[in-house]
Design a protein with these regions (language model features):
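Intrinsic-disorder/low-complexity, polar/charged segments enriched in Ser/Thr/Lys/Arg/Asp/Glu/Gln
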Residues: 12-18, 25, 61, 75, ...
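Short amphipathic alpha-helical signal-transduction/dimerization elements
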Residues: 157-165
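Hydrophobic/aromatic beta-strand elements that line small-molecule binding cavities or substrate pockets
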Residues: 19, 51-52, 76-82, 117-125
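Short beta-edge strand/loop motif at the mouth of beta-sheet-based domains
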Residues: 16, 36-79
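Beta-strand/loop substructures that line and gate deep hydrophobic ligand-binding cavities in soluble
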Residues: 90-94, 100-154
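Hydrophobic pocket/interface hotspot
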Residues: 28, 38, 62, 80, ...
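Hydrophobic ligand-binding cavity/cleft-lining segments
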Residues: 1-48
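A short, structured loop/turn motif at beta-sheet edges
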Residues: 25-26, 56-57, 81-89, 123-132
Length: 167
């Protein structure tokens, strides 16, 4: 099971979540970089992930989909800016359509103050056979967008912990 080691940072426009997973770093890396693995955990509780494309190289893109229990699909895309295997990924994040074209958050009924693009840095550090994951998302306004992203990521990380325990 994953444990949250720090409260999320509430600094204006930055969300930082740190979790420790009972799995080796290489396995956590694979969970983020292998499409079949991503589809096993991506999305909040109750959501599934029916599609995932990853072009894991600097300048490459990803296109991930999560589906709500009601059947609504939410697509996200981004560009990889930095990759240091198995330690760090820096990428942009945007809502998208099924073809990978960025769309505003309002396309999915999300308040318009949600930014068109954020920047995320994923860091994985080994800790005595476990992995400390830190996700830092920049350009995310304080308030509802910040709280919603925090809740969604933490639910996804709970699912990631379950996936890693079965891997």
């Amino acid at each position: 099971m994953a444990e949250q080691t720090e409260a999320p940072t509430t600094e204006e426009s930055v969300l930082v979540i740190t979790r420790v997973f009972d799995a080796p770093r290489e396995l956590v890396w694979k969970a983020w970089t292998d499409p079949e693995s991503v589809m096993r955990w991506w999305g909040p509780k109750g959501y599934t992930s029916p599609a995932c494309q990853i072009d894991l190289r600097v300048g490459g893109k990803y296109l991930w989909c999560m589906r709500s229990p009601e059947g609504q699909e939410y697509w996200s895309t981004g560009v990889y800016r930095e990759i240091v295997e198995p330690e760090r990924i820096v990428c942009t994040n945007s809502f998208a359509d099924a073809d990978g074209n960025p769309v505003p958050a309002s396309h999915y009924g999300i308040p318009e103050d949600f930014p068109g693009e954020t920047l995320s840095t994923l860091t994985l550090e080994e800790r005595e056979g476990k992995t400390e994951l830190t996700l830092r998302t920049e350009d995310l306004p304080a308030g509802e967008a910040h709280e919603s992203a925090n809740a969604g990521w933490n639910e996804a990380f709970d699912k990631l912990a379950d996936h890693l325990s079965q891997a």
